[in-house]
Amino acid sequence: MGQHIASSESSTNGHVSLETNGDEKTDYSRWRLIDDQGRQSWRYLESDKERVDWPQTTYEKHFLGLDTELPDLTKAQTPLQAAQGAMSYFSQLQLPSGQWASECIGPLFILAFVVIAGYVTDTPLPAGYAVEIRRYLFARQCVADGGWGWHAEASESSAIGTVLSYVVLRLLGTTRDDPRLVRARTLLHEFGGATHAPGLAKFWLCILGVMKWECVNPFLPEFWLSPDSDPASPSKWYLHTRTNFTSMSYVWSKQWSYAGDAITEQLKAELYTQPYDTIDFAGHRSSLAAVDNNYPKWWLVNLMNWLTVAVYIPYFRKPATAESAERKVWDLIVTEDKNTEYIGLSPISKAANLVACYIHDGPDGSSVRAHRRTMGQYFWMTQDGMACNLSDGIQVWDTSLAVQALCAAGASSNPRFQSTLVKAHAFLADHQLLEDVQDQEKCHRWPRKGGWPFSTRYQGYMISECTGEGLRSAMQLQGISHLGLTQRIPEERLRDAVECLLNLQNDTGGFGVYEKRLGSPKLAWLEMGEFVGKTMVTYDYVECTTAAVSALLSFSKLHPNYRAAEIEATTAQGLGFIKQSQKPDGGWYGAWGVCFTYAGMFALETLALAGETYATSEASRRGCDFLLDKQKDDGGWGESYLSLQREEYVQHEESQVVQTAWVCMALMHAGYPGREPIKRGLRLIMSRQQSKGQWYQEALEGGVGDG
C-alpha cells in the first residue's frame, strides 16, 4: 500500500491525534484552502514553520468548524439587524479571488470512484486526506444496520453505498476486523455480496481487480460509431451520461484491471458470500439487491445486454471494429480533458478519464500527470472529515447568489461592504465564458459563449441557471454607480449571455441544465441507472427555467430594444412552462435543491418579476398556499432530501434555517398579504443565529437531480 498512501505518522508529521472512539484525526489548525484564481483545493501543512508563515483565515476556520475568533455581536432584535450581522460574518468568508466557496455534497458513492481511480493509477493520496476520508465515512455509517446509503444523509443502507464505502475504508488502511466493518460486511452479505451491487459499482470493482469483467453488463464503445442522426446515438443522451459512458466504454473495451496487491486479495475474500474462485460472475451480470433496484431496467435493455454478450461479442465483434470504436472514444476523452483543463465534468467522468489515460498513455504519461494535478479540486474538508464534491466547486453559482443576498441586505450602501461587492463583480467578470470550445460539433458541446459555469471558466461547462443568475448579479452590480467599478462587463458580453439563454429553450418552453434536449423522450426506454433514474434524456427543470426567465426579464427592463420580440416570446413560453409544471397541490418540484421549498422560492420570484403575485395570479396563490401548509409548529420549514426521490413533499424531522429562509423569501416575493407566517419564520431564523452573526450547517440543502 506504500505507493498509494504514505503512513499517517510520517506524512502528517506526527500531528494526528486519536478521538474517543480510537479513530485518527488530523490537526484542523493545519488545513489551508488554496484559491488559485477560483480553483479550490485543500492542503495540510506539515511543518510548524508553514503554519506560522501561512496563518489560517476566517473562512478556513469556518469551513472546519473552528472558532473564527471574530467578535461577538449584540443580539439582533429585528430582522434587519440579524441580516446586518449575517452580512458582517458572511463578508469575512469571501476568498481572495472574490468568490465564496462551499461544499457541494450529496451522493456518497462518488467518493469511492475518485479514491479507486487514484489507487489503481498509483496517484498518491496525501495522508491527511486518507485520515479525514475515513472519519467522514464512519460519520456517515448508518447506525441501524452498519451499512451506508447512496446519499450522504441516508438513514437506510444500500448495496452500492455499503460495498463502495467498505472498499474505500479498506484501501485507506482500516482493518477487516474493525467492528464497524464487520457489521458492514455482514450487511453486504445479506444483500447478496458485491455481485448484487448496481452495475456502476461492479464497473469500479472490476477496475480495482476484485471482480471479473464478466459480471458487468457491456459498455460498448461501438455506440459512438453510429451516426449522429441515429436517434439512439450517445450524442443525443443526457450530457453526464454520455460523458461518463465515453471513458467507461474505453476502459470496459480494454477489460483493464489493477494488477492487485495484498489488500485487493483480501477484498476478494471479504466482499462475497462464497469463495472468489467458485463464483459464476457471468451469471450475476444482472443480479441486483432489491434495495438498490429503484428504477428497474426495461425488458428492452435486458434483451440488448443479452444479445451483446451472447451473440455480438463472441460471433460478430471484430477486432478492427473494436479498435475503431476505441479510437473514437479516445479522441472524445482527449477533447474533454483539453476543454476542461483535466478537471472534467464531474468526479465520475474525472475518475474514469484518469484510468483511461493511464491505460493509453502509461503511468507517467502527460495526461496522467495532468489528471493527478487536478484531482484535489474535488475533495472538500468538512467538520466531519473529507468528502467529495459533486463538482469541482460551485464558485460562480454561490457568488452570484451571494451578490443578490448582500445587495438585498443593503451592502451596496454600506462603505464597509462595497469592496466585497467589487471583488465579487471582478470574479464574475473573470469567469464568464468568452468563447465556444474548439470543434464543438465534433465533441458534441453546446455553444457556451457568454454563459457562466457552475464553478470556474477553467472547467468551462456552461449552465443555464448559472448564466441566468450570473447575468442578473452582474447587471445588478453594474447598476450601482457609487461602487465605482473600474472594469465593467461590456454590454456586448451581456448580450452574449442573453443569446446564450435564448439558444437554450426547448419546445416545451422549459430549460435544461447544459443544452437543449437533443434526443427523443423515448430514450428513457434505455435507462440503466438502477438506483437512480432519469439519466438518458435531457429534461426541463423549473429552477433552470426560472433563472433564465428572470434574467431575461431583468435584462429587458434595462435594454428594452435588444431582441425585444425574441425575449418576450421566450419569457412568455418560459412562464407557461413554470405554470404547467406546478403540481395539483400547488408545489413545484426542484431537482437541484431540496426540493419543493427550493423550487417554490424561484418560481414565485419569477412570477412576481412578470407581474404575477398572490393578488393577481392563481399560480402564485396556489404556490403560497402549498408552502404555508407545510409550516411547522415552531414557525419554520424543514424538508427532507427524500422529497427528491419520492417526488412529493417529505417533512424533515426539524425545521431548517435555509429552507425557512427560502419560503419566507418566496412569500415576500409573491406579496403574500398575511404577515404572521412570515414573522414566525423570521423568528425561527433569528433564534438560531449565532453570536458572530452566522448560522450552523444543518441538513444538506443541495439536490442531486432525479436520484
From Swiss-Prot:
Function in brief: Terpene cyclase/mutase; part of the gene cluster that mediates the biosynthesis of the meroterpenoids arthripenoids. The pathway begins with the HR-PKS atnH that catalyzes two chain-extension steps to form a reduced triketide, which then primes the SAT domain in the NR-PKS atnG to initiate three more cycles of extension to give a linear hexaketide corresponding to the polyketide part of arthripenoids.
Per UniProt, which keywords does this protein have? Isomerase, Repeat
Q: What is its EC number?
A: 5.4.99.-
Which portions of the chain have biased composition (kind: Polar residues)? 1-20
- State what the entry records as the consequence of deleting this gene: Abolishes the production of arthripenoids but leads to the accumulation of a new compound that possesses a sesquiterpenoid chain with adiol group at C12' and C13' position.
UniProt pathway: Secondary metabolite biosynthesis; terpenoid biosynthesis
Tell me the segments the record calls region Disordered.
1-22
User: According to UniProt, where does the site described as Transition state stabilizer lie?
Assistant: W397, F454, W592
Q: Determine the domain of life of the protein's source.
A: Eukaryota
The molecule here is called: Terpene cyclase/mutase atnI
Name the GO terms of the biological process aspect: ergosterol biosynthetic process; triterpenoid biosynthetic process
Can you tell me which family this protein belongs to? Belongs to the terpene cyclase/mutase family.
Q: Pull one GO CC term from this UniProt entry.
A: lipid droplet
Q: Where are the PFTB repeats?
A: 130-173, 494-535, 571-608, 620-661
UniProt-recorded Gene Ontology molecular function terms: lanosterol synthase activity
